[in-house]
Amino acid sequence: MSDSRQQLIALGAVFESAALVDKLARTGQISEAPLGCMLGSLLARNPASTLDVYGGDTLNLRDGFKALASALERKPGSLQREPLRYALAMLTLERQLDKRGDMLDLIGQRLDQVEQQVQHFGLVHENVIASFASIYQDTLSTFRQRIQVHGDMRHLQVSSNAARIRALLLAGIRSARLWRQLGGSRWQMVFSRRRLLNELYLLLRG
């Protein structure tokens, strides 16, 4: 798999998290499969490829690819504004996290603990999701710049929804970190927009 394809998969995963956060905030509901895919990416160890981090199937990131395509196409009518805002905010927070080795160590330690929990409860159990959410709350949400999630307050005030949103933001920032480690940069979204779109269309068709 080419470097650009691997970068695109990781960036698509950032947008997948963003799209799931948006849907959850607006409707109060998301499917278990995409939630499980993104939570599983937080615990992926020594994957054979970038795609293996996300279950080995591009279909798992389809909504993310669509949201990313809407951002790159620059068509006001089809732009998914909130997912784009969340995705860009996650990329920004990842840059801040990169300067905090202590926080990265803490997140790693806490994820090790969650992995043990998963063996007992399963990946999408509410206790596991609450643990992912508390990692986000204790670390990334302490930064001055926070991600403001917009949606229906009836859904946002439900504690289980709030926990899922925080867990998804943690997963999105993990994917942002992977994207940058693979050589991704925001400049590519500006100067290589057409190339990215062409490759994205291939992923969506595949």
From Swiss-Prot:
Topology in the membrane? Peripheral membrane protein
| Major location category of this protein | cytoplasm
Superkingdom of the source species: Bacteria
Q: Which residues cross the membrane?
A: none
- Cite the entry's keywords alphabetically: Cell inner membrane, Cell membrane, Cytoplasm, Membrane
Instruction: Output a single Gene Ontology CC term carried by this record.
Output: cytoplasm
Q: Where in the cell is it found?
A: Cytoplasm; Cell inner membrane
Electron transport as UniProt keyword = no
Q: Which SUPFAM superfamilies match?
A: YcfC-like
Q: Which Pfam families match?
A: DUF489
Membrane among keywords: yes
Q: Which family does it belong to?
A: Belongs to the HflD family.
Q: What is this protein called?
A: High frequency lysogenization protein HflD homolog
Taxonomy of the source species: Bacteria, Pseudomonadati, Pseudomonadota, Gammaproteobacteria, Pseudomonadales
